Amino acid sequence: IIGPVLGLVGSALGGLLKKIG
């Protein structure tokens, strides 16, 4: 469970960072 969740969270954070940065 933790693996896939971290992947989704990581991708989400990456998208936000790209939008902000």
Swiss-Prot record:
Residues with D-allo-isoleucine modification: 2
UniProt family annotation: Belongs to the bombinin family.
GO BP terms: defense response to bacterium; killing of cells of another organism
GO CC annotation: extracellular region
Locations listed in the record: Secreted
Chief location category: secreted
Keywords: Amidation, Amphibian defense peptide, Antibiotic, Antimicrobial, Cytolysis, D-amino acid, Hemolysis, Secreted
Tissues where this protein is expressed: Expressed by the skin glands.
Transmembrane segments: none
Organism of derivation: Bombina variegata
Function statement: Has antimicrobial and hemolytic activities.
Superkingdom field: Eukaryota
Residue pairs linked by disulfide bridges in the UniProt entry: none
Protein name, per record: Bombinin-H5
Lineage: Eukaryota, Metazoa, Chordata, Craniata, Vertebrata
Modified sites of kind Isoleucine amide: 20
